[in-house]
A protein has these predicted regions:
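Low-complexity, intrinsically disordered Ser/Thr/Pro- and acidic-rich segments
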Residues: 1-4
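N-terminal cap/lid segment of alpha/beta-hydrolase-fold proteins
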Residues: 9-27
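Conserved HGGG/HGGXW glycine-rich cap/lid loop of the alpha/beta-hydrolase fold
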Residues: 26-120
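A structural alpha-helix within SAM-dependent methyltransferase catalytic domains
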Residues: 59, 139, 167-170
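Catalytic nucleophile-loop/oxyanion-hole region of alpha/beta-hydrolase
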Residues: 87-91, 123-135
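Conserved acidic catalytic loop of the alpha/beta-hydrolase fold
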Residues: 103, 132-150
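Conserved hydrolase catalytic core segment
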Residues: 148-187
Length: 188
C-alpha cells in the first residue's frame, strides 16, 4: 500500500508540473527535462493522449544520454487549449493522479477523423484545425523555448505531425522518428 501511495504521489506531482506557452493562437502545456544547453528531443504524443503518457524511464534514459527533452499536450488534450467543450472526465482528470487520469481520459475519447480530415470532437462538431496546424504548434513551441533544431519523435498521430514537420520545416529537424504511425490520413 505504501508503494502504491508513493507512486500515486509521484504521478500527482508530475502531472502538476510544467508551464503554459501561448503560441500559434493556442495555449500549449509543456514540460522539459535535462540541461537546456544539450541537444533537444521533442516528443509528440498521439491523438487524445497527454504528453504524460511518455514513459518516464524513456525520458530519463534520454536525459542520461545528455539530451534535453521537451514534451507537450497537443490542442484539445490535457492542459492545452480546448476548442470545443472540454469533457467533464477530462476536467476531472486534470486534478487526479496520472495513473487514474490516464484511465479516465482513455475511456472518454474515441480517436476519429471525419471525411474532411478534421478531428471529430466529443460534441460531434469537427475541429477547426488539422495536422498542419498541430505541426505549427510544435514549431512555435520550439520558437518560444529558443530551440533552433531538435530531434523530433512522434507516436501514432504524433508521428504524422513529425512527418509534416519534416516536410514543412526541414531546417528545424535534426532527425525524424515516427513511431506506430502512418504517412497520413486518407488514401495512401
Amino acid at each position: 500500500l505504501a508503494i502504491l501511495a508513493t507512486e500515486l504521489l509521484k504521478q500527482f506531482v508530475r502531472s502538476n508540473m510544467g508551464e503554459i506557452a501561448s503560441v500559434n493562437n493556442v495555449d500549449i502545456w509543456w514540460e522539459d527535462y535535462g540541461e537546456k544547453s544539450n541537444t533537444t528531443v521533442l516528443l509528440i504524443m498521439g491523438a487524445n493522449a497527454s504528453a504524460l503518457y511518455w514513459d518516464r524511464t524513456f525520458i530519463d534514459e534520454l536525459v542520461a544520454n545528455d539530451l534535453h527533452v521537451v514534451i507537450f499536450d497537443n490542442r484539445d488534450v490535457g492542459k492545452s487549449s480546448w476548442f470545443n467543450s472540454e469533457p467533464l472526465l477530462v476536467k476531472l482528470a486534470k486534478f487526479l493522479p496520472h495513473a487514474v487520469s490516464k484511465k479516465l481520459v482513455s475511456s472518454a475519447f474515441k480517436s476519429m477523423v471525419d471525411d474532411d480530415g478534421n478531428f471529430a470532437m466529443p460534441d460531434g462538431k469537427g475541429a477547426k484545425y488539422d495536422l498542419n496546424d498541430m505541426a505549427k504548434d510544435a514549431i512555435c513551441l520550439m520558437d518560444h523555448l529558443g530551440i533552433e533544431q531538435a530531434h523530433i519523435v512522434g507516436a501514432s498521430m504524433g508521428g504524422m505531425i513529425t512527418q509534416i514537420i519534416g516536410l514543412d520545416y526541414p531546417e528545424r529537424a535534426l532527425s525524424l522518428t515516427p513511431i506506430m504511425s502512418s504517412p497520413g490520413v486518407g488514401d495512401a
